[in-house]
Regions:
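Asp-based, Mg2+/Mn2+-dependent phosphohydrolase catalytic module
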Residues: 1-3, 39, 100, 114, ...
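Residue-level recognition of specific faces of alpha-helices
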Residues: 74, 91, 95, 105, ...
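N-terminal helical cap/lid subdomain that shapes the substrate entry/recognition surface
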Residues: 2-94, 101-105, 113-118
Length: 218
């Protein structure tokens, strides 16, 4: 029986693309660079903040000093904007409360910077998660399992009773690296065909399908 539900954050629990888009747009404009569209922004999400900024710079971030200056400016803006527009996907609150009512545990393992992840979750989902982990500088992001293994040990996550839920290839690959079932959600930032090419255990189109998908896992 699945007792440990490990969620991605951006594109899985929250639609954070508008906040990310505003922060990157303002930073690009401040540096005299061409803007990117909201749709483009969505395709950059999933690999962590530094990968996101590299993608938005479209090759202009190859200079290390320039990239670090730009990245610092972006992070200041994103920290200021991240609580303004982010919205909970329909059905997510019910999923999380059901997990809690069943005596099971929900966790977040995200490539978003750790401090911002904790701040956002404390604001939007107080007391619904047993553990929250974001990316820490100097460590490898998902799908590397090094930090997850430490996280799992700290929170008593038993992998045979676990499932990984997310909207992007790193989430599916993370679950596969851990040897646990994966549920890919199509309402986030990755096309269904792309998700299917990574062979998740289940694919769902709406948050209200997540728990039924978990029940159907053999």
């Amino acid at each position: 029986m699945i007792k440990h539900y490990i969620f991605d954050l951006d594109g899985t629990l929250l639609d954070t693309a508008p906040d990310l888009a505003r922060a990157i747009q303002d930073t690009l404009i401040a540096f005299g660079l061409p803007p990117v569209t909201l749709q483009e922004t969505k395709t950059f999400i999933g690999g962590g903040a530094r990968q996101f900024v590299h993608a938005a710079l479209k090759g202009k971030g190859d200079d290390h000093l320039f990239f670090e200056k730009f990245f610092a400016a972006y992070m200041i803006r994103y920290e200021a904007y991240q609580l303004e527009v982010a919205s909970i996907y329909p059905g997510i609150n019910k999923v999380l409360k059901t997990i809690q009512q069943q005596g099971h545990h929900a966790y977040i393992f995200s490539n978003k910077p750790h401090d911002l992840t904790v701040k956002l979750i404390d604001h939007v989902f107080p007391k619904l998660f047993t553990g929250v982990h974001g990316h820490v500088p100097g460590t490898l992001p998902k799908p590397d399992r090094t930090m997850f293994d430490r996280f799992a040990l700290r929170h008593g996550i038993h992998l045979p009773d676990s499932v990984f839920i997310g909207d992007a290839p790193p989430d599916v690959l993370m679950g596969q690296t851990l040897g646990i079932p994966t549920i890919a959600v199509t309402y986030g930032y990755t096309d269904r065909a792309v998700l299917a090419s990574y062979h998740p255990t289940k694919i769902v189109n709406h948050a209200n399908e997540i728990l039924e998908a978990v029940k159907s896992i053999k």
